[in-house]
Each structure stands twice: as structure tokens, then as C-alpha cells.
Amino acid sequence: MPEAVIVSTARSPIGRAFKGSLKDLRPDDLTATIIQAALAKVPELDPRDIDDLMLGCGLPGGEQGNNLGRIVAVQMGMDHLPGCTITRYCSSSLQTSRMALHAIKAGEGDVFISAGVEMVSRFTKGNSDSLPDTHNPFFAEAEARTAEVAQQEGTTWHDPRKDGLVPDAYIAMGQTAENLARWKGVTRQDMDEFGVRSQNLAEEAIKNGFWEREITPVTLPDGTVVSKDDGPRAGVTLEGVQGLKPVFRPDGLVTAGNCCPLNDGAAAVVIMSDTKARELGLTPLARIVSTGVSGLSPEIMGLGPVEASQQALRRAGLSIDDIDLVEINEAFAAQVIPSYRDLGIPLEKLNVNGGAIAVGHPFGMTGARITGTLINSLQFHDKQFGLETMCVGGGQGMAMVIERLS
């Protein structure tokens, strides 16, 4: 059975939504640029040998609609290349990598592009398609319950299923973070310290050249070249973030200092069978060892990485002690903290260059972005095995184990 190996990665800088460096770019234009950058790193590959372009997008509507994956293929002049657009919210472009892994293992193709994009700046009225009243009335009572809790103080999460009630499948991510923090005993101090850690580590990684190794500079319509992420801030202190006000509840724990912002960006990963890589004379960057995906209550979705990671580790025949570096997407400190604690991950292995609290989280981009970052980190720190994992809106988790090969 062939192995699935990663031969190239590329990503854009990450912009702040609505006010950042990439706000004037279309998602299809940026995605095409980044996929072409990833392909340029493997000139031995004939584009006609690519079996499929699978594009992850958290909210595929508006400019991100119309099967964006296929739009991008045609835009790049590859009419021969099939394209699809996949959403699993925050893990959309980890899902596309999983699909490439499965296709290669099944013998149904040798070369795949797994890419991801999210351009929140291009959303209208807060969502990608701007259509009103699309929620199913089946969840109306659950949504009303969430709204009521959001106005209360001192509320600890209780599983509605225990009362025969339906959970809120549309719950805002910030409310899930508040639920999880209280349910798992995570304090505001814990969260603020983690947020500062992310920013400080990202600042240090910028200084030592880590981030520039993986960023593809992007040229804006006015000719400006963007080569750095908008998010990382120098000199962030605990005292500074402790003064920030809660965002989601009157007595809330989540602030702008301990969660990710809204962002724009795109990333791409070129995945092929090990037999095809040998045929082309390529030395792969990494091998995809295993993946996992989990489901749990939408109201505490942030704990999704735990079961998903346990699945991936079991399938890899590894324990968490065998993993050298871990990347947990930092949607909220409120969910990273209980996830790494439950998994038994030492802090010195976790998000060692900072994470999404600092660099950002464009939903559809993040899966592919973290894959590239993890490979970069395994190379930079000379390590072998890495675990990528994230929580997913709607109450899911996803994970992937990779082994560095070069």
C-alpha cells in the first residue's frame, strides 16, 4: 500500500479581517497565487499528473462560493484539473489532506493539491452569503437558551442532552469557549498567561527567522508586497492583557488577548504517493502517518482535539510521549488549555513558535497552514514526529500525525 507524503507547502501572510493587509484581495486570486507558489517548489511535477484540487473553505459562499476549488483550477489555466470545495469549518483544509491520504491509500490517484482559504474581509453582513434566517427552527429553543445564558453571570455549562434537550448547533464560538472554560475550571489568569505566551513566542520566532521560512510574499493590486503576518505584536505583557474587557459575557473570561482574531489568508500542500515521489526523484518533506476526527456537544466544541488526537495516535501506534512537537490551533486559550492538559502534552512541546492567538486563524486556511508550520518547526528544531490538531465549529475535532522525512 502506498504512503502519502508531503512534497511542498506554501502559505500567504495572514491579514487582519476588514482592516488588515489582505482585505482588498479576492479569495480565488489569493488561492491561485499560493497554489502556484507550492507547485513552483516541485518543478519536476507535470501539472497534468495532478489528480485533484481539493480546497478547504470554512464558509463557502459569496466570493468563496461557486465551487471555488474548480474556479481556481480554471483560473490557473488547468482546465484538465478537477476541483472541489470542502467545508469542515476550522479543519476544512485538514479534511482535504485527509481525503488525499485516503485516495492515495486506496490507489485512486498519486498527486493531490490540498489547499485552504478564508477571506473574512470579503464577507457581507458577517457571513459569506449574506442570506438571512437560514437557521433551522428545530434549534430555536436551544438558541434562545444560549442567548439567555450569555446575559447571565456565574453560569456553569450543563449538558442539555441530560435534560432531554437539544444542544445549540449554531452557538457562537465565543460562547462555547466560555462554556468550556467554566466546565473545565480554566481561569482568566490561565487564559491570559497563555495568550501572552503565544504572542511572546511568535515575537521570538520572528526574530529568529522561523516564520519568514514559510511565508510566500503576496503582491497587492497597488503593487505593495506583503511578507509578514499582521497579528504578532512585540512586547505583549500579562499586565497589558489583564486590562482587556470580556467580549462575550458580562462576567466573561474570553478577551481579545486570549483568543484569535478574524483573519484572511490561504495555504496549500502538495501531497503525493511515495512511489510517485521516488519516480520524480523528490525527497518528501514529511509522511502523513494517520488522522482522526471526533464529534462532541456543539456547546463545548473546543475539547474536540482530545478524542481526535487520541484516534490519530492509536492509528499511528504512538503515544503522546512519542510526539516531539504539537500544534493545537489556538481558537481560544479557553479550549487549548483543557485540550493539552487532558492529552498530557508538555508545554515545552506545544505551539513552540506561537499560535493562532498571535498569527491568526483564517478558518479554511488553518489546516493547511498548520501542516506547513509543523513541518517547518520539525525541521527548524530538528525533530521527527508532529501532531496537528484543532477544534471545529459545530462540535468536532480533527488531528493528523506526521513524520518528518527531510
Regions found by a protein language model. Give the residues of each.
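Condensing-enzyme catalytic core mediating Claisen C-C bond formation in acyl metabolism
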Residues: 1-27, 150-156, 163, 239-303, ...
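Conserved active-site "lid/cap" helical segment
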Residues: 1-58, 62-72, 76, 176-188, ...
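N-terminal extracellular/periplasmic Venus flytrap/periplasmic-binding protein-like
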Residues: 11-13, 24-33, 44, 152-154, ...
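Active-site pocket-lining segment
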Residues: 55, 175-178, 216, 221, ...
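Beta-strand segments within the central parallel beta-sheet cores of soluble alpha/beta enzyme folds
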Residues: 47-56, 84-88, 112-116, 190-197, ...
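Conserved catalytic cysteine-centered active-site region
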Residues: 25, 57-112, 152, 168-171, ...
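Flexible glycine-/small-residue-enriched beta->alpha junction loops
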Residues: 111-179
